Design a protein with these regions (language model features):
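Absolute protein N-terminus
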Residues: 1, 17-18
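Sec-dependent signal peptide recognition
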Residues: 1-8
Length: 149
C-alpha cells in the first residue's frame, strides 16, 4: 500500500513537471497596473508552487550586424506565476526575448520575437527546456526574413 502511495505521488509530480511551460500575452492580460508599460507578460503553467519558479530573460539580437545579448529584468506581478518583461533593448535591430524557467526539477523555455509593433505571438516558440543557441539563431534569421517581406 505504501509503495502504491509513493508511486502515485511520483506520477503526479512527474505529470506536473512535464507540463511546466509559459503562456505569453499582452500587458492588459495581467490585469495589473504595474504591467501597463511592459512589452509583454507571461504566465507559468504546470508548476505546483509558482511562487518558487526561477525565471530569467535575455534579449538576443542583431544590432548593426553585430550579435548582442542583454540581460533583462523580469518583474513578478502580485499574482504568483505572472511576470512582466519591460523594454530593455534598443529600438533598432532585430530582437528576440529568450525566457528560461525552472520549477523544482522541471525546465521551460521560450523565444519571443519582437517586431516594430511589439511581441509577435504567432512566431513565438515554446520548449520543455531552455532554447539552444541554434534555435535562437534560427529564430533571429526568421525574424530578419520576416522584416524584409
Amino acid at each position: 500500500m505504501l509503495r502504491l502511495g509513493i508511486a502515485a505521488c511520483a506520477l503526479v509530480a512527474l505529470a506536473l513537471a512535464e507540463g511546466f511551460t509559459f503562456t505569453i500575452g499582452s500587458p492588459v492580460a495581467s490585469q495589473d497596473f504595474q504591467a501597463k508599460g511592459a512589452s509583454f507578460v507571461f504566465r507559468t503553467e504546470g508548476c505546483a508552487d509558482p511562487a518558487k519558479s526561477q525565471i530569467s530573460a535575455t534579449a538576443e539580437g542583431l544590432l548593426k550586424g553585430e550579435r548582442k545579448s542583454l540581460t533583462l529584468q523580469v518583474m513578478a506581478m502580485p499574482k504568483p506565476g505572472i511576470y512582466a518583461v519591460f523594454l530593455g533593448w534598443p529600438a533598432e535591430g532585430d530582437w528576440i526575448v529568450n525566457l528560461k524557467g525552472t520549477c523544482a526539477d522541471a525546465k521551460a523555455g521560450a523565444l519571443v520575437p519582437i517586431g516594430p509593433k511589439g511581441f509577435i505571438r504567432e512566431a513565438s516558440k515554446f520548449f520543455p527546456r531552455p532554447a539552444t543557441d541554434a534555435e535562437i539563431e534560427t529564430s533571429l534569421k526568421a525574424l530578419r526574413q520576416r522584416g524584409k517581406k
